[in-house]
Design a protein with these regions (language model features):
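A conserved hydrophobic helix/loop-capping motif in glycosyltransferases and polysaccharide synthases
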Residues: 4-16, 27, 36, 251-263, ...
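Acidic donor-binding loop at a coil-to-helix junction in glycosyltransferase catalytic cores
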Residues: 160-170, 425-432
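Short, acidic, metal-binding catalytic loop of nucleotide-sugar glycosyltransferases
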Residues: 20-31, 269-279
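Active-site microenvironments that recognize anionic phosphate/pyrophosphate groups
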Residues: 495-607, 612, 627
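Glycine-rich, basic loop-to-helix element that forms the pyrophosphate-binding segment
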Residues: 57-71, 313-331
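A conserved acidic beta->alpha catalytic loop
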Residues: 37-45, 85, 286-296, 315
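Conserved donor NDP-sugar-binding/catalytic core segment of glycosyltransferases
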Residues: 90-122, 349-382
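Short, flexible, basic/aromatic active-site loop/helix in glycosyltransferases
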Residues: 117-141, 369, 382-402
C-alpha cells in the first residue's frame, strides 16, 4: 500500500497542521501533500518541508476541484475539506485505503472525534443513501475519493463557475458513479469551530445572507435529479376538485399537544380568534398530557363549542398519529391547517388567507411564512422565514435538498386522508410535503402568517449528536423513498392508491358506513359464471346480499306505498352525496354488484329512466372516466 494517496489539506494557519504534516510525511501510504490556501504569498517559503502550496479561492469551488484533479497522480485523494486542527488516528490511513479498495467505493468517509470547547467527544456520522441529497450532509472534514473519478468530474465540468457548490456537485456526481461508503470507525480528531446549538444551525439555509450559496446548490440538485430520472415537471400537475366531498366545516385548525400547559391557551385562543367568511373549528388532540394541559383545553371548550377536544385511545401516537386522528374525524373540515402548541398565528386573518390561497392557486397544500421569536414575541435571527427560494417550477425538486418547507402548513383534507401522516414526531410534515408535491401544486404565501416561539421547552432547541443523526437519517430515508417513487412514476408506474376524486369519495363513504363496507367486503364471496352467446361473453353473478334490493316488489302499488330510497329525505344518515351537476347526484350504492358501484339519481323525485339522458350520461363519463365499467 505504498504511495497510494495524495493529500490535499485546506489550511488557513499552517501551524495548526504542522504536527500532522510531519506524521503524514512519514506514512508509507502518502505520495504528495498539497496545502490549499487562499493566498500562497502570505506563507512565502515558510511551510513544512515536503509540501507544496496551491492557491485556491475556496475548498468548495469547482475551480478548486479542477486544480486538485490536475495535480493528483496517486490512486486516491485524501481531502481535508475545511481548515481545522487535525489529528489522524494510528493506522487510520491504512484502514481507509484498505476499505476504499475492498469496497470499490467512489468515496469513503468515517466517524471522528471532535474537540468542542476543549472537551473530546464522539462525533459519529450516518450512512449515505440515495436520498442523502441535502447539501449539509455531515461527512466530517476528511474524505477519501478515487482520483480517476475526480478527474472525470473535472473533464465533464471544465466550464463550471460554481463558487460555493463545487464540492457538493462533485459529491452528487460520485453518488451516480459509485458508492459513497460510511466506515463507522473513529479514525481522526478535528476541532469543531461551530458550537451553536442545533436549534440555531437548522435555519442557516434560509438565511438571506446565504442566498447565492443556495441558488448554486439548487442548480446542482436539479441537474442531479434530472440525471437519475427523478425530476418533477410541474406542468403535469393534477388540479384538486375541492367539491369532491361535502363538509360541514370549511376549515379545521389542528393542534396536537402533550404537556404544554404554559403555551396551549395562547395557541387555542389564537386559533379561535380568527375572522373568516366561513365556518371553522379547532381540533386539539391531547396526547395524554400529565400536566394541566387537558384541564386548560376543557375549560376553553366549555365556553366555545368550536373547540373539539380529543384524547386518543392509543398510547403509541406521535405527532403524525395525532394528526391522523384529527383529519379522520368526521368533524374535520375541507382544509386542515397546522398550529403547533407552542406557536401563534400572526393575525386574525391567517385562516382566511390560507383558504383563499387554496382556491386561488388550485393547490392541494398551502405553506405560509413564519417569524422566529422568543416567548415574549421579540424577533430572533434570522427573523422571517419565507422560503423565497421556492418557485412553482422547481420548488418540488429543490424540496429534496432542504430540511424543511415552512409553516403554517395546510392540506386539502380528502387528499390528506388518502395519504395519511407517518406516525412520527419528527419529519412527518416534511414527508407529506414531498408526497403532495409529486403530483399536486404547493401554494405559497410569502407574507408573515405565523409566530414560531423559541424557548427552552422546544423539542429541537439543543439536540445531542445522536438525536441529530437520528433525525437526519430519517429525513434522508424520506428523501430516498420519494426519489424512488418519482423515478417509478416517471417510468409510468401507477400509484398504489388510485388518485381520483371519485375513488376518494367512494373510499371515504365505505370507511364511514359499516353496513356498506360489510357488503362490499362480502363481494369477495360472490360466485360468477361465464356463458358464451354467439360472439359475446356473459357473466352471471350469484350475490345473496343483493336480494334485498333486487327481490323487492316493483309493481306500481308497491312503489307508491314505499318511500323512495333515492330521495335525500329517505336516505340512510350515513350516506354521502356528491353533486355532479344541476340535475344529478352521485351516491355509493350500498347493495353493490361491482367492486366500486355508484348510483346516479336525479335530484327530483321522478322515474329514474336513462331514456332522454343519454347525452347527459356521456358527458358524465367524459368528466368522470372512473364511472366507466370496463
Amino acid at each position: 500500500m505504498r504511495q497510494k494517496i495524495d493529500c490535499f489539506l485546506t489550511c488557513d494557519c499552517i501551524d495548526n497542521l504542522k504536527e500532522e504534516i510531519a506524521r503524514l510525511r512519514n506514512s508509507r501510504t502518502i505520495q504528495n501533500i498539497v496545502l490549499l490556501t487562499a493566498d500562497a504569498s502570505d506563507n512565502g517559503d515558510d511551510y513544512p518541508e515536503g509540501c507544496t502550496l496551491m492557491e485556491v479561492d475556496s475548498p468548495r469551488s469547482a475551480e478548486t476541484i479542477r486544480k486538485i484533479a490536475a495535480t493528483a497522480t496517486a490512486e486516491y485523494i485524501l481531502f481535508l475539506t475545511k481548515a481545522t486542527t487535525l489529528t489522524i488516528g494510528q493506522t487510520a490511513l491504512e484502514r481507509l485505503l484498505r476499505v476504499a479498495s475492498d469496497s470499490n467505493a467512489a468515496m469513503v468517509y468515517s466517524d471522528h472525534y471532535s474537540v468542542e470547547g476543549g472537551k473530546l467527544v464522539n462525533h459519529p456520522a450516518i450512512d449515505y443513501q440515495k436520498g442523502s441529497v441535502r447539501d449539509d450532509f455531515d461527512f466530517g472534514s476528511l474524505i477519501m475519493i478515487k482520483t480517476p473519478l475526480v478527474q472525470k468530474y473535472a473533464r465533464e465540468n471544465q466550464d463550471s463557475q460554481l463558487a460555493f457548490a463545487g464540492l457538493y456537485d462533485l459529491r452528487l456526481f460520485l453518488s451516480r458513479e459509485g458508492e459513497i461508503f460510511h466506515l463507522n470507525e473513529f479514525l481522526y480528531t478535528e476541532e469543531e469551530q461551530d458550537l451553536r446549538a442545533s436549534g440555531q444551525k437548522q435555519f442557516d439555509y434560509v438565511n438571506p445572507a446565504n442566498r447565492k450559496v443556495q441558488v448554486e446548490m439548487e442548480q446542482c440538485v436539479t441537474r442531479h435529479l434530472e440525471r437519475i430520472g427523478a425530476l418533477i415537471d410541474t406542468s403535469d400537475y393534477k388540479t384538486p376538485d375541492f367539491n369532491e366531498q361535502d363538509f360541514d366545516t370549511e376549515a379545521t385548525v389542528v393542534i396536537p399537544v402533550r404537556n404544554r400547559e404554559r403555551t396551549i391557551r395562547d395557541a387555542i385562543e389564537s386559533a379561535l380568534s380568527q375572522r373568516a367568511g366561513f365556518d371553522y373549528n379547532v381540533i386539539v388532540v391531547d396526547n395524554h398530557s400529565t400536566d394541566h394541559t387537558g384541564d386548560i383545553v376543557e375549560e376553553i371548550r366549555q365556553k366555545d363549542q368550536r373547540l373539539i377536544h380529543i384524547i386518543p385511545e392509543r398510547n403509541d401516537l406521535g405527532i403524525g398519529g395525532c394528526w391522523n386522528l384529527a383529519i379522520n374525524d368526521a368533524r374535520c373540515g375541507r382544509f386542515a391547517v397546522q398550529l403547533d402548541s407552542d406557536d401563534l398565528y400572526s393575525g386574525d386573518d391567517t385562516l382566511q388567507r390560507i383558504v383563499d390561497a387554496f382556491k386561488r392557486d388550485k393547490a392541494a397544500m398551502i405553506i405560509g411564512s413564519y417569524r422566529m421569536c422568543d416567548f415574549d414575541l421579540n424577533t430572533l435571527p434570522p427573523g422571517l422565514i419565507d422560503h423565497h427560494e421556492w418557485t412553482d417550477e422547481n420548488g418540488p425538486n429543490n424540496a429534496l435538498r432542504i430540511n424543511g418547507l415552512g409553516a403554517p402548513r395546510a392540506f386539502f383534507t380528502p387528499l390528506l386522508r388518502q395519504i395519511q401522516f407517518p406516525n412520527t414526531s419528527y419529519g412527518e410534515d416534511y414527508a407529506l410535503g414531498l408526497i403532495f408535491s409529486r403530483r399536486y401544486r404547493i401554494g405559497r404565501i410569502f407574507d408573515e402568517l405565523y409566530l414560531c416561539r423559541r424557548w427552552g421547552g422546544n423539542s429541537d432547541a439543543a439536540l445531542s449528536i445522536e438525536k441529530i443523526n437520528a433525525n437526519n437519517l430519517y429525513k434522508d430515508r424520506l428523501r430516498t423513498l420519494e426519489i424512488s417513487a418519482r423515478q417509478q412514476m416517471l417510468k409510468g408506474k401507477e400509484d398504489i392508491m388510485a388518485d381520483t376524486p371519485l375513488l376518494r369519495f367512494f373510499n371515504r363513504q365505505v370507511e364511514t358506513w359499516d353496513d356498506a363496507r360489510r357488503r362490499y367486503r362480502d363481494l369477495q364471496k360472490v360466485e360468477t359464471r361465464e356463458l358464451q352467446y354467439e360472439d359475446h361473453t356473459l357473466t352471471l353473478q350469484y350475490n345473496p346480499a343483493r336480494i334485498t334490493s333486487t327481490g323487492a316488489s316493483i309493481d306500481r302499488k308497491a312503489i307508491a306505498e314505499r318511500p323512495c330510497f333515492l330521495c335525500e329525505a329517505n336516505r340512510p344518515q350515513e350516506q354521502f352525496k356528491k353533486i355532479i351537476d344541476d340535475r344529478f347526484e352521485l351516491l355509493v350504492n350500498p347493495y353493490p354488484i361491482l367492486p366500486t358501484h355508484f348510483t346516479i339519481p336525479s335530484k327530483r323525485h321522478e322515474p329514474q329512466r336513462i331514456k332522454g339522458n343519454f347525452d347527459e350520461m356521456m358527458r358524465l363519463l367524459t368528466d368522470y372516466p372512473d364511472l366507466m365499467v370496463k
